[in-house]
Each structure stands twice: as C-alpha cells, then as structure tokens.
Amino acid sequence: MASKSPEWNPTLDQAVAKERCGARSYSWETLSESDDVSAIAQKTYTNGFKCHMEYSLDAGSVEFLVPKDAKTFTITAGQSDYSRDTNVTVTFEISDPISDKVLDSASLRLNEAKEFSIDVSSVPRLKMKALVEAAPGESRKSNISITVIWADPKFS
C-alpha cells in the first residue's frame, strides 16, 4: 500500500519570495489577519493571501518551495467580490520559477474563480503570479481598484 503524502497548507510567512503588487508596491496580506472579508464569487475564504492593485498592468507574486514527497498543489484564485472595478480581467498564473515553465493559468473577471490543481512531483518551487490586464485602449496609467486573492493553498 502506497503511503499517502502529508498535507501542508503553506502560509504567507513561509513564502521564499514575494514580489510586491504593482506600481505602488502594496504588500501581500494574509487573509486570516485581514480586517476585510475575503470572498471570491460569493464564497468566503480565511486561508491564503491577497494584494491590492491600482493600475492596469500591475502584477505581484508569491513563491513557495515544494515540500519533499508532495504530489499535488491546489489553490483557488480570483478577484475579491469587493473590488470596485467590475470590468477588469486578472490573469492568475502558476509557474516553475526555475525553468520559467507556466504550469497553468486563467484569466478571470469579477465573480469568477478557478481552483488550480498542479502536479508538483517534479517541481522544486512554485510561483503564483497575478497580472491585471489592460482593457483595449487602456494603458499603465489607467486607474483601477481591485484586490486579487489566492485562497486555500494546499500541498498533498
């Protein structure tokens, strides 16, 4: 009988690298320590991390080392239900930062969520990146107000 790999829910404090969010360099915030409700598509989350972004083409990322014997990484991504701009699309991307190989991505609008499930058996490190897309005719100077959320991260 094969042994089941242990589950591990990484926290923001355990990240090995963090890229601040956008031109104003907002910091990533732990959902459990936030004063605001963190909800994606009407589902509330308390485990994970989020960051505020104010301009088109803003981006931010968080990286974790993959634990030994981990086979799968799951995480849910989306924009906070309380984001003020409803016409903004955010691309959520999970990659191997060592090889720069994109493992999965999704472009999500407000009220959309995606649960990623990534095979990490041969990946030493994961990078979760969020990039605010510029709508046609917009530029980096276009002001927006959204919060991106990565929720319920779990290695198993």
Whereabouts are the PLM-identified features?
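Gly-Asp-aromatic-enriched flexible segments
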Residues: 3-156
